[in-house]
Curated annotation (Swiss-Prot):
CDD domains: LplA. Its main location: cytoplasm. Pfam families: Lip_prot_lig_C, LplA-B_cat. It catalyses: L-lysyl-[lipoyl-carrier protein] + (R)-lipoate + ATP = N(6)-[(R)-lipoyl]-L-lysyl-[lipoyl-carrier protein] + AMP + diphosphate + H(+). In the transfer reaction, the free carboxyl group of lipoic acid is attached via an amide linkage to the epsilon-amino group of a specific lysine residue of lipoyl domains of lipoate-dependent enzymes. Monomer. Its EC number is 6.3.1.20. Catalyzes both the ATP-dependent activation of exogenously supplied lipoate to lipoyl-AMP and the transfer of the activated lipoyl onto the lipoyl domains of lipoate-dependent enzymes. This is Lipoate-protein ligase A. Keywords: ATP-binding, Cytoplasm, Ligase, Nucleotide-binding. It is found in: Cytoplasm.
Amino acid sequence: MTTLRLLISDSYDPWFNLAVEECIFRQMPATQRVLFLWRNADTVVIGRAQNPWKECNTRRMEEDNVRLARRSSGGGAVFHDLGNTCFTFMAGKPEYDKTISTHIVLAALNSLGVMADASGRNDLVVKTPDGDRKVSGSAYRETKDRGFHHGTLLLNADLSRLAIYLNPDKKKLAAKGITSVRSRVANLTELLPGITHKQVCQAVTEAFFVHYGERVDAEVISPDKTPDLPNFAETFARQSSWEWNFGQAPAFSHLLDERFTWGGVELHFDVEKGVITRAQVFTDSLNPAPLEALAERLQGCLYRADKLQETCEALLVDFPEQEKELRELSAWIAEAVR
């Protein structure tokens, strides 16, 4: 009986694909070696412990219908589009070893005519006259008895969009600049014009089979019917939920300030698990009562633009004479946290 399992997703939904990955990882026998191949439509994928409001331009993402997906592994934020080929290798311990999966990906690239090397902990790079350029990045997750290595191969990704949706660390930005960060990345189509997602998947699959000396038929995973995976519906519901993607952010504080014709306003929020735990309002408005009431009502509110707007507009019942101010305030808060 084979110890290999090959799964290929025909969905571009990041929440679907990450839910499939999670279910397979949790229920696989410890003796199995799994390769899962997939790709996502426009998505920012963040690490398990990251704050989306800090890492991403959430307002621009909403405008452009770019999804946010939190993965279960650590590491940084990345932008996925259909120009990325994603892979996940899984194995039980003690066999799990990320150097094996890295070797398989390097062998696949080599078979296509691309000589790449592992660099640092997470990257695969190719040497060019301009220096090393990254063609793959990875992240890892381990539990007591198993582990996985997942990553992307940059096939024909729209690299310019990295700068639009990801807010780089200001120190990195000052030191390197957006252009130099972008120049360190390369698409495989620059090295192999015409290369396709299907060809990359075939190369990785063949290298996987060769390494283990076994072959197995691929299982195609489709959203057209619920995958036959234990607890998939619950896992997908969690993976696609606001509570997981936004609410799992580490505790943080947010300061908003604005000057209106009727006065200046400063809002201080403390947020834990996507919920406002403390709100303070400072203002030089001649009528601070509605703002003081707002601070009280915001405690316990979800840190979501629509919920903040609802809370603000609910004050119109108690303060109808301040309708103009409250509507301006409501629109500003919603825009500031979107």
